[in-house]
C-alpha cells in the first residue's frame, strides 16, 4: 500500500507542477497587466508618506500646511486600483535600485510639483543622508550623495523650442534643441499641456513657426499635437530607449468649474475638503487627454504613459487653493497640488513601474 500511495502522491505532485508551469505565464501576465489608473481614493491613516513641515524641498506655493491650511485630510487618502494593490513606496529600495543613476523630469510647474514630491519621499526615507541642490541654466539637480542618485528637473514648458529672433520670440513646433540635455539620462518623465492655452503677458512667445511657415497664432490644441509629434519623432530617432526608460506624465487636471464634479455652486476648488469617492469624474476626461494618447500611439519606441488624469480629477480637495502662492487674497490655485498630496501617488505609481 505504501508504494502505491507514494506513486499516487508523486503523480499528483507531477500534475500540480505541470499545472503551475502552465499557469505561471498567465499569473505573470495578470500582474503585468494590472490597471493602476482605475480605482478610488480610500482613507488611510498611515498616509501621508512624509511630513511636509519637515521636508526641506517644498516650495512656498505647494506648502499648504505651512501656509495655514487647517485641514490635513487631503494628505491622508491612498489610491486603491480596482484590480490590484499598489506596492507602498519604499524610498530606500528606490535609492538602492537607482544607485548611480540620473532621473530627470522635463516639463512645466506640474513636473516641478512631482519632482519636489519625489525628493521629499526619498529624503524622508534617509533623513540623515547628505544631499545637494544645484542649478545650471534651466536644470536643477538634487543629488543624494550616498547613493549617487541625481534627481533632475529641466523646466521646459512646451518641450519644443522658443528661439529669440529679430522678428520676436518664436515657438518652433518642429524643433527640439533641448534634447541634448536629455539623452544621457537613465529615466525621463516628460510633461506638457498647461502653458498651451496661455495668452497675453503670460504667453512667452510672439510667433509660431512650422517649417518655413510663420504665423501669429493658431489653434492651441492643434499646436500641442504637432509639438507632441515632434517630441515623438525625437524619441524614435535620437533617444536610445535600451539605455533610457521614458515616461510621460499624463494631463494633470484643474478644478475651476464645480458643475463638472456635480456642484454647480462651486466656482473653484476653494473650500473643498473631500475627494470624489467614486471611480469616475462626472465631467469626463478633458479633450487634451485623447490628443496625448493619439500622439503617444504613433511612437515606435517604448514610452509609458502615467495616466494620472482620472485619479487626479477625483481630488478637487487637494489643490493649494488660497493656501498657495497668492495667499488668501487670491482667487485660489486649483491647478497645482499641495505637498504632501496627489503627486505622491503619481510617484508611487512611477515606483511600481521602476522598482517593483
Curated annotation (Swiss-Prot):
Localization (cell): Membrane
Cellular component terms (Gene Ontology): membrane
Motif (DCXHWCLPGXXDXWN motif): 333-347
Keywords associated with the record: Membrane, Signal-anchor, Transmembrane, Transmembrane helix
Position of the signal peptide: none
Transmembrane stretches, start-end: 12-31
Superkingdom assignment: Eukaryota
GO function term, MF aspect, one: O-acetyltransferase activity
Keyword presence, Transmembrane helix: yes
Membrane topology: Single-pass type II membrane protein
Chain span(s) of sequence motif GDS motif: 107-109
Family classification: Belongs to the PC-esterase family. TBL subfamily.
Stored PANTHER family: PROTEIN TRICHOME BIREFRINGENCE-LIKE 41 (PTHR32285:SF58), PROTEIN TRICHOME BIREFRINGENCE-LIKE 9-RELATED (PTHR32285)
Functional summary from the UniProt entry: May act as a bridging protein that binds pectin and other cell wall polysaccharides. Probably involved in maintaining esterification of pectins. May be involved in the specific O-acetylation of cell wall polymers.
Other notes: Contains 2 motifs that are conserved in esterases, but it is unlikely that this protein belongs to the catalytically active pectin esterases.
Official protein name in the record: Protein trichome birefringence-like 41
Protein species of origin: Arabidopsis thaliana (Mouse-ear cress)
High-level lineage: Eukaryota, Viridiplantae, Streptophyta, Embryophyta, Tracheophyta
Amino acid at each position: 500500500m505504501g508504494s502505491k500511495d507514494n506513486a499516487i502522491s508523486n503523480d499528483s505532485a507531477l500534475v500540480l507542477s505541470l499545472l503551475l508551469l502552465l499557469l505561471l505565464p498567465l499569473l505573470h501576465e495578470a500582474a503585468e497587466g494590472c490597471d493602476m489608473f482605475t480605482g478610488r481614493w480610500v482613507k488611510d491613516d498611515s498616509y501621508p508618506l512624509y511630513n511636509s513641515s519637515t521636508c526641506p524641498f517644498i516650495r512656498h506655493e505647494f506648502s499648504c500646511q505651512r501656509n495655514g491650511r487647517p485641514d490635513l485630510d487631503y494628505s491622508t487618502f491612498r489610491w486603491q486600483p480596482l484590480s490590484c494593490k499598489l506596492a507602498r513606496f519604499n524610498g530606500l529600495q528606490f535609492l538602492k535600485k537607482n544607485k548611480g543613476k540620473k532621473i530627470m523630469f522635463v516639463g512645466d510647474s506640474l513636473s516641478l510639483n512631482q519632482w519636489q514630491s519625489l525628493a521629499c519621499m526619498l529624503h524622508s526615507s534617509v533623513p540623515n543622508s547628505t544631499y545637494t541642490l544645484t542649478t545650471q541654466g534651466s536644470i536643477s539637480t538634487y543629488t543624494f550623495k550616498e547613493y549617487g542618485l541625481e534627481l533632475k528637473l529641466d523646466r521646459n514648458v512646451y518641450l519644443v523650442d522658443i528661439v529669440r529672433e529679430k522678428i520676436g520670440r518664436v515657438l518652433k513646433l518642429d524643433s527640439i534643441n533641448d534634447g541634448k540635455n536629455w539623452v544621457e539620462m537613465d529615466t525621463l518623465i516628460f510633461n506638457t499641456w498647461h502653458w498651451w492655452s496661455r495668452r497675453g503677458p503670460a504667453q512667452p512667445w510672439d510667433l509660431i513657426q512650422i517649417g518655413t511657415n510663420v504665423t501669429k497664432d493658431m489653434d492651441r490644441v492643434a499646436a500641442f499635437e504637432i509639438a507632441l509629434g515632434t517630441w515623438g519623432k525625437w524619441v524614435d530617432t535620437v533617444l536610445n530607449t535600451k539605455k533610457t526608460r521614458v515616461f510621460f506624465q499624463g494631463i494633470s487636471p484643474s478644478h475651476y468649474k464645480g458643475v463638472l464634479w456635480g456642484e454647480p455652486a462651486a466656482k473653484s476648488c476653494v473650500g473643498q475638503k473631500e475627494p470624489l469617492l467614486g471611480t469616475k469624474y462626472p465631467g469626463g476626461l478633458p479633450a487634451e487627454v485623447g490628443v496625448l494618447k493619439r500622439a503617444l500611439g504613433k511612437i515606435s519606441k517604448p514610452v509609458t504613459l502615467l495616466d494620472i488624469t482620472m485619479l487626479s480629477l477625483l481630488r478637487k480637495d487637494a489643490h493649494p487653493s488660497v493656501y498657495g502662492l497668492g495667499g488668501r487674497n487670491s482667487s485660489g490655485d486649483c491647478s497645482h497640488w499641495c505637498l504632501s498630496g496627489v503627486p505622491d501617488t503619481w510617484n508611487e505609481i512611477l515606483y511600481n513601474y521602476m522598482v517593483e
